[in-house]
From Swiss-Prot:
Its EC number is 3.5.1.-, 3.2.1.143, 3.2.2.-. It is found in: Nucleus; Cytoplasm; Chromosome; Mitochondrion matrix. It comes from Xenopus tropicalis. This is ADP-ribosylhydrolase ARH3. One of its GO terms (biological process) is peptidyl-serine ADP-deribosylation. Keywords: Chromosome, Cytoplasm, DNA damage, DNA repair, Hydrolase, Magnesium, Metal-binding, Mitochondrion, Nucleus. GO terms for cellular component: mitochondrial matrix; nucleus; site of DNA damage. Mg(2+) 2 binds at residues 27, 295, 297-298.
Length: 350
């Protein structure tokens, strides 16, 4: 396996950043009109937003912590990551963190817990969170580790810091795998989905994954079922936004947002009739996610992380990039992650 070019690494981090920043403007809107969205995007094109920088949310704040941790610790270090999450929250708490994860950070910072996973396991009467917080921040794992077993292990482990339910951390695994395969370049959507399905079948066969799904009165293998639904949707020309929200979701649960992000990326590989033809694939992906409503910042950040890894930074207009808080860090870290990825790849093949 050859390493992808640095443009894909920078593109993935910049895409994730822009998906979060732009998606946050529309989060929670029940009916985002195309006219309003397109006018907003035109203002970005013209540079009208440069005077007032678009700020990122907790999605990017935690993604930044993962990136910094994997860059500064050659071996994955869960204690370091836990400390970074807590320190970053205490430094800048007004990023839109949910109360559940705030309680985890408060407990981690108290010094009263011997194991870093214990606070997350106490959440929701011991069931743990199955939200999308673990998935929204995981992009750095995919960009630091070329081997599938490492991606799965570290996506799971990093997720378990805040999401003890397998439905939460399995969503992080799926998102991390999607970014990984997007990094590899040209790939037929069906092949892309088949590869994800092969891995998620194995991930979802463990006892906890099956019991967690049944406890929520879901079918076994919820992520595999969603991936099959994506396949079916891609084979149709008449899929509406209402269909997507009903079958894939647009909520804060991981299983109602990670599959939606993957579908949005794949759907936007081709022109979408209701979106302006002049948009790049990556811009189209962000716009498509926003029009679905709901948890727009998180779905857009995940979808754009995948799209950026696939298409590269060339698809990001300069004024879009310049409008986002932290874009220089994303560029710099993308280059450093590319170097780290290449070193690891070389060590596995030598």
């Amino acid at each position: 396996m050859m390493a992808a070019g640095v443009s894909r690494f920078r593109g993935s981090l910049l895409g994730a950043l822009l998906g979060d920043c732009i998606g946050a403007v529309f989060e929670g809107h029940t009916n985002v009109t195309k006219e309003f969205l397109f006018d907003y995007m035109k203002s970005l094109d013209k540079g009208e937003r440069l005077k007032r920088v678009l700020t990122y949310t907790d999605d990017t704040a935690m993604a930044r912590s993962i990136v910094q941790s994997v860059l500064e610790n050659y071996e994955f270090n869960i204690e370091d990551l836990a400390n970074r999450f807590t320190t970053e929250y205490n430094r800048d708490p007004d990023r839109g963190y949910g109360m559940a994860v705030v309680h985890v950070f408060e407990k981690l910072g108290s010094g009263e817990y011997k194991h870093v996973f214990s606070p997350a396991r106490e959440q929701f009467d011991g069931k743990g969170s199955y939200g999308n917080g673990a998935a929204m921040r995981v992009v750095g794992i995919s960009l630091a580790y070329p081997r599938i077993p490492d991606i799965i292990e570290y996506a799971r482990t990093s997720g378990m810091l805040t999401h003890a339910s397998s439905l939460g951390y399995n969503g992080a695994i799926l998102q991390a795998l999607a970014v990984h395969y997007a990094l590899q370049g040209e790939l037929a959507p069906e092949t892309f989905l088949d590869q994800l399905l092969d891995h998620m079948k194995e991930v979802e066969t463990d006892k906890k994954s099956r019991s967690d799904a049944l406890e929520l009165e879901m079918d076994e293998f919820p992520y595999c079922n969603k991936l099959r639904k994506i396949k079916a949707f891609l084979a149709r020309e008449d899929v509406t936004r209402k269909d997507i929200v009903k079958e894939l979701g647009n909520g804060i649960q991981a299983f109602e947002s990670v599959p939606t992000a993957i579908y949005s990326f794949l759907r936007c590989l081709k022109p979408v009739s209701e979106l302006p033809s002049e948009l790049t694939n990556l811009q189209r992906t962000i716009a498509f996610c926003i029009l679905l409503g709901g948890d727009t910042d998180t779905i857009a950040t995940m979808a754009a992380a995948i799209a950026g890894a696939y298409h590269g930074e060339e698809q990001i207009p300069l004024n879009w990039k310049l409008s986002a808080e932290g874009y220089k860090d994303a560029e710099d870290w993308g280059e450093k992650l590319h170097q780290l990825y290449c070193r690891r790849l070389q060590s596995t093949t030598s």
